[in-house]
């Protein structure tokens, strides 16, 4: 059973030029023991002087685990079970520098527990209970016309988070994340959207903080975490076509890979991704999203969410 809710609002209702802030609430409960509750959004202050991006969620679910590295995830015999519990609090406060540029501090807290681990040797001796506290900065360029359903513009987000040992982290490492999105209207009712993203972990990340392929935003259709390593690179292109009234359809193609260091990148390790989706306009510029994604060797998955994947 899933529940999603979303809202748009302006901190100054009289300023029609100010982009609307957005907030999304999401939750899931299943009969197999999965539950999740979270909230995320962007709060834009009057005159767009500041912005706050935030994500808070926790979940618990029985999951499959293959180990770390492309080769481990690619081997079906490594599939094992565990119960994973995770909580995350992540936020940034950005100052508007002008000309669509924003920069400011960010903080992140993660707490991960692995219970009932069927094959503990796949954790490579790492603790089953880990937590990480980090701080850093985010630099953003954002010329999108609408944050939740862009028709045109460019979005670039570079985030650097440090998790040093003196902050109490048992696993000390730093994370560099880059996301680049572009949007163009190609014909009547059609939007072409491109997305590139990478996560690079330098140091000693725990099994629960590795870069994971597969989620509701990228590499849709892959089991999240089957392919995990210190680093990942992903890219996708999506065509969004309005059909009739509140109804739209999408198709996408993409690819991604995980690796422990750049010298280990191999063309044969690049994983394909493609799929199609349906959009129902819940309210202006807010879509309910249903996607079905496909991956390597028959891997596939159904996703239900709010707002676009990127």
Where in the sequence are the language-model features?
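Transmembrane beta-barrel architecture of outer-membrane proteins
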Residues: 36, 84-88, 132-136, 153, ...
């Amino acid at each position: 059973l899933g529940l999603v809710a979303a809202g748009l609002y302006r901190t100054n209702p009289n300023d029609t030029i100010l982009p609307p802030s957005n907030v999304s609430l999401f939750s899931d409960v299943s009969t197999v023991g999965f539950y999740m509750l979270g909230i995320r959004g962007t709060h834009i202050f009057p005159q767009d002087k500041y912005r706050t991006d935030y994500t808070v969620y926790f979940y618990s679910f029985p999951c499959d685990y293959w180990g770390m590295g492309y080769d481990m995830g690619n081997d079906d015999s490594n599939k094992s079970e565990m119960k994973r519990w995770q909580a995350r609090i992540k936020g940034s406060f950005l100052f508007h520098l002008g000309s669509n540029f924003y920069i400011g501090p960010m903080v992140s807290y993660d707490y991960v527990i692995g219970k009932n681990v069927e094959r503990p040797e796949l954790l490579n001796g790492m603790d089953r209970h880990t937590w990480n506290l980090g701080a850093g900065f985010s630099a953003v360029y954002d010329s999108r016309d609408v944050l939740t359903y862009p028709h045109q513009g460019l979005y670039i987000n570079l985030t650097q988070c440090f998790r040093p040992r003196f902050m109490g982290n048992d696993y000390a490492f730093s994370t560099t994340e880059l996301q680049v999105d572009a949007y163009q209207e190609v014909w009547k009712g059609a939007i072409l959207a491109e997305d590139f993203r990478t996560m690079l972990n330098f140091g000693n990340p725990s099994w629960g903080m590795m870069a994971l392929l597969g989620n509701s935003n990228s590499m849709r259709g892959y089991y999240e975490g089957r392919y995990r390593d210190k680093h990942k690179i992903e890219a996708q292109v999506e065509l969004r076509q309005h059909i009739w009234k509140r109804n739209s359809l999408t198709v996408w193609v993409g690819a991604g890979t995980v690796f422990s260091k750049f010298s280990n990148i191999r063309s044969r390790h690049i994983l394909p991704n493609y799929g199609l989706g349906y959009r129902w306009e819940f309210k202006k510029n807010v879509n309910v999203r249903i996607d079905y994604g496909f991956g390597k060797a028959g891997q596939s998955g159904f996703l239900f969410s709010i707002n676009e994947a990127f």
